[in-house]
């Protein structure tokens, strides 16, 4: 039987597995699928986590949900550190407590070049499973709390622009269509 990888080794593993995954772009309907629970941490899940981390770092981004790479399982990778060496893996995450409200500027790898303000909880407590298969709880505030909530929205089929007014959503959609036409030309 293969031993689960310790949480700290995931970032090391990413240095050797170099699979960059395709990130879905808003308004792709697959971004609205609700992710399912991960029943167990298998070799395939470890490989997916490694590939997601590599994709996130290469993009570059600070968080990525499996939904964004068209895998509809409850998996998130995050690294908000300045040194980009503190990978956090959350499998089957759930927010069990939250407090405060803060409006922050957000962007998304699935909505490239678009940034806007969203109000979220200032602090959250999350329960999740790590890549080692062990359950844990953690408190998060600031950018980490925002990132966790943003990525968990993806697992529920929601993209951050859906918090914005219909007018802003329409303008964003127009801008993204223009970007897509420029890339084709």
UniProtKB/Swiss-Prot annotation:
Gene: def2
Co-factor note (free text): Binds 1 Fe(2+) ion.
Catalytic center residues: 151
Top-rank lineage group of the source organism: Bacteria
Class in the EC hierarchy, top level: hydrolase
UniProt-listed Pfam families: Pep_deformylase
BP terms from Gene Ontology: co-translational protein modification; translation
Protein task: Removes the formyl group from the N-terminal Met of newly synthesized proteins. Requires at least a dipeptide for an efficient rate of reaction. N-terminal L-methionine is a prerequisite for activity but the enzyme has broad specificity at other positions.
Single annotated GO MF: peptide deformylase activity
Entry EC no(s): 3.5.1.88
Reported cofactor(s): Fe(2+)
Residues annotated for Fe cation binding in this entry: 108, 150, 154
Protein source organism: Nitrosomonas europaea (strain ATCC 19718 / CIP 103999 / KCTC 2705 / NBRC 14298)
Protein name: Peptide deformylase 2
InterPro entries, per the entry: Peptide_deformylase (IPR023635), Peptide_deformylase_sf (IPR036821)
This protein's UniProt keywords: Hydrolase, Iron, Metal-binding, Protein biosynthesis
Family: Belongs to the polypeptide deformylase family.
Catalytic function, reaction form: N-terminal N-formyl-L-methionyl-[peptide] + H2O = N-terminal L-methionyl-[peptide] + formate
């Amino acid at each position: 039987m293969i031993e689960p990888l310790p949480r700290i080794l995931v970032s090391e593993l990413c240095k050797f597995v170099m699979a960059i995954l395709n990130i879905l772009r808003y308004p792709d309907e697959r971004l609205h699928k609700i992710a399912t629970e991960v029943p167990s941490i298998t070799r395939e899940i470890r490989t997916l986590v490694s590939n997601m981390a590599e994709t996130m770092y290469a993009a570059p981004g600070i968080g990525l949900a499996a939904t964004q790479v068209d895998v509809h399982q409850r998996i998130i990778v995050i690294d908000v550190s300045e040194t980009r060496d503190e990978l956090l893996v959350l499998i089957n995450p759930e927010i069990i407590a939250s407090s405060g409200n803060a409006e922050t500027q957000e962007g998304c790898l699935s909505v490239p070049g678009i940034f806007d303000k969203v109000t979220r909880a200032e602090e959250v407590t999350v329960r999740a499973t790590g890549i080692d298969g062990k359950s844990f709880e953690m408190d998060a505030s600031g950018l980490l709390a925002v990132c966790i909530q943003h990525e968990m929205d993806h697992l529920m089929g929601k993209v951050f622009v859906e918090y914005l007014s219909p007018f802003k959503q329409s303008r964003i959609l127009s801008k993204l269509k223009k970007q897509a036409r420029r890339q084709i030309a």
